[in-house]
């Protein structure tokens, strides 16, 4: 009997070797794209790129390249039996990331099309998915019937960082990121699907989708909160409480970072996210992430690696720029540490790396410094990164610091500027911002070319503002809307506001004095009126009357 049990145990071991084999996640690089057998061809890009991605290439004269082709399905199918899980694929790097048992490594290496295998990280552990209950929705309905609001009040907590860059002047000219797509690569977006600051972009379908490249999970809303905070600086919209830098842009929320560990695999997660962003037709990548050292010290980068051509993530960031996207990356928060220098991918060429200043425009002590190892100016630009107010996961607003939070200030406003100048390439847009930064004539290693002036970059002059037309937003509206009043000479008399329905019935009649009108009027009087089209008549002086339609949903 004992002999039979021993035989059974030996058979069990022989047939279940993989159960006891140690598994890890590896990078598997291929030698080529197998173009003879690959069903994807460059002459048929609709099979692997979105229409918007193809349009971007055509608009800026960017040719399709071998790096645009997906991996060879034949190669993947050949090695798939030896993989526990396939995590990500990279057409740019011609590689994939997979969890593999140690006993399968030699079998994978034996394939002639396998160029290299490289350890990246331990296997994925069970993710922590602790959802926060009891989200408190902030009530913003207690508004006066019609009141005047200055810019500083309208923007709420974000007036200071936005006005420092004159971003509010872009917004006044109706450039708020409309028709621009921003991909946010981050560690998670907890409660973005619930928080009131994102209600505006949710109800207007401005969240195009989500992906998790870090753990292959279908949800990004129950993980880390860092991306939530970053996104709020661009997409937040609660008038008089919190207005972000690009509230009309559309967003992809892409999780590439695992908050509890740091391995080189996260750079490859980022690469997969950037490739997805490209294929989906993204205009701007916001990356408030950076890498220097890892939990496995053999994977650590050195300052010599900060040349834009060595680390995987920096090579991918340059590749993303070559596809026509504007990549905006945080410089890093190690300016007061031994490392001191920028982190990857901030060292990449052709992208914008962003440092931090305090509310007075002075260098923030923690902001990572340049130059790159090969002597290029880094960071290129700077924005406020001290005392930034961001959305917390419990619907409160908290104050925080870091280049993670100066970066979306630049990304969002860059989307607004690109909206105004769609004919510019990403490189031309970058150069336009650099030329209009306050240290352009004398860049340094702390702030690079300095703080960009988006009004000047947008060719907005004071005399233009004085001639600007009345602007009504949001239009369509649901409960309330705002009227931007141009700075024309109104004299000493009152400003008259009248609103009519399509039957010609006057449903609102208000007047304001020049001293109280300011730049913006908030109207809440139509909250109880039926949906439909209304006519606004605004008389600024006897010679200046504007009529405009507005739609209530």
For every predicted segment, state its role.
Residues 1-24, 523:
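Bacterial Sec-dependent N-terminal signal peptides
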Residues 20, 465-473, 477-553:
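C-terminal outer-membrane/trafficking sorting elements
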Residues 20-85, 103-129:
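Primarily auto-inhibitory N-terminal propeptides
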Residues 23, 40, 158, 168-211, ...:
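Subtilisin-like serine protease catalytic core
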Residues 74-162, 168-171, 349:
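Autoinhibitory propeptides
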Residues 159, 280-286, 419-471, 475:
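C-terminal subdomain of the subtilisin-like protease fold in secreted/lumenal serine endopeptidases
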Residues 171, 237-240, 253-350, 360, ...:
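Substrate-binding/access-modulating region of protease and related hydrolase catalytic domains
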Residues 186, 346-419, 423:
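Extracellular S/T/G-rich loop segment that most often corresponds to the catalytic His/Ser-adjacent loop
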């Amino acid at each position: 009997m004992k002999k039979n049990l021993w035989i059974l145990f030996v058979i069990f071991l022989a047939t279940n070797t993989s159960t006891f084999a140690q598994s890890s996640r590896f990078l598997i690089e291929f030698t080529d794209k197998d173009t003879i057998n690959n069903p994807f061809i460059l002459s048929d890009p609709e099979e692997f790129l979105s229409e918007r991605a193809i349009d971007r290439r055509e608009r800026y004269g960017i040719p399709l390249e071998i790096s645009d082709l997906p991996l060879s399905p034949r190669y993947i199918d050949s090695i798939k039996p030896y993989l526990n899980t396939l995590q990500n694929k990279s057409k740019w790097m011609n590689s994939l990331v997979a969890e593999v048992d140690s006993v399968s490594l030699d079998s994978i290496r034996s394939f002639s099309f396998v160029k290299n295998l490289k350890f990246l990280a331990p296997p994925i552990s069970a993710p922590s998915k602790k959802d926060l209950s009891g989200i408190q929705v902030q009530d913003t309905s207690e508004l006066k019937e019609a009141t005047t609001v200055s810019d500083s009040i309208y923007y709420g907590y974000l007036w200071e960082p936005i006005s420092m860059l004159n971003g509010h002047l872009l917004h006044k000219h109706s450039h708020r990121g409309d028709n621009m797509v921003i991909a946010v690569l981050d560690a998670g977006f907890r409660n973005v699907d619930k928080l009131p600051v994102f209600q505006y972009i949710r109800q207007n379908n401005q969240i195009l989708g989500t992906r998790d490249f870090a753990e292959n999970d279908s949800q990004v809303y129950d993980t880390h909160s860092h991306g939530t905070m970053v996104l709020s600086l661009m997409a937040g919209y609660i008038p008089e409480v919190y207005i972000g830098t690009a509230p009309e842009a559309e967003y992809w929320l892409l999780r590439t970072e695992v908050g509890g560990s740091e391995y080189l695999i996260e750079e490859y997660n980022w690469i997969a996210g950037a490739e997805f962003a490209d294929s989906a037709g993204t205009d701007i990548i916001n990356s408030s992430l950076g890498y220097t050292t890892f939990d496995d010290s053999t994977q650590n980068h050195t300052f010599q690696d900060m040349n834009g051509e060595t680390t995987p993530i920096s090579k991918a960031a340059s590749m993303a720029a070559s596809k026509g996207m504007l990549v905006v990356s945080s410089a890093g928060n190690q300016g007061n540490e031994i490392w001191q220098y920028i982190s990857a991918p901030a060292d990449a060429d052709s992208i914008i790396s962003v440092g931090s200043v305090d509310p007075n425009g002075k260098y923030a002590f923690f902001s990572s410094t340049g130059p790159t190892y090969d002597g290029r100016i880094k960071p290129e630009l700077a924005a406020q990164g001290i005392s930034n107010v961001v959305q917390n996961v419990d619907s409160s607003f908290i104050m925080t610091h870091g280049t993670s939070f100066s970066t979306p200030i630049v990304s969002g406003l860059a989307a607004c500027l690109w909206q105004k100048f769609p004919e510019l390439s990403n490189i031309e847009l970058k150069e336009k911002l650099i030329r209009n930064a306050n240290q352009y004539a004398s860049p340094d290693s702390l702030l690079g070319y300095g703080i960009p002036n988006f009004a000047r970059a947008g060719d907005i002059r004071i005399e233009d503002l004085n001639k600007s037309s009345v602007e009504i937003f949001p239009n369509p509206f649901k409960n309330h809307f705002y009227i931007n009043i141009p700075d024309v000479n109104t004299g000493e008399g009152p400003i008259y506001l009248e609103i009519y329905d399509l039957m010609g019935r006057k449903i609102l009649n208000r007047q304001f004095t020049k001293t109280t009108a300011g730049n913006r009027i908030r109207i809440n009087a139509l909250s109880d009126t039926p949906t439909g089209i209304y006519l606004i008549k605004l008389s600024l002086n006897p010679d200046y009357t504007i009529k405009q339609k507005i739609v209530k949903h």
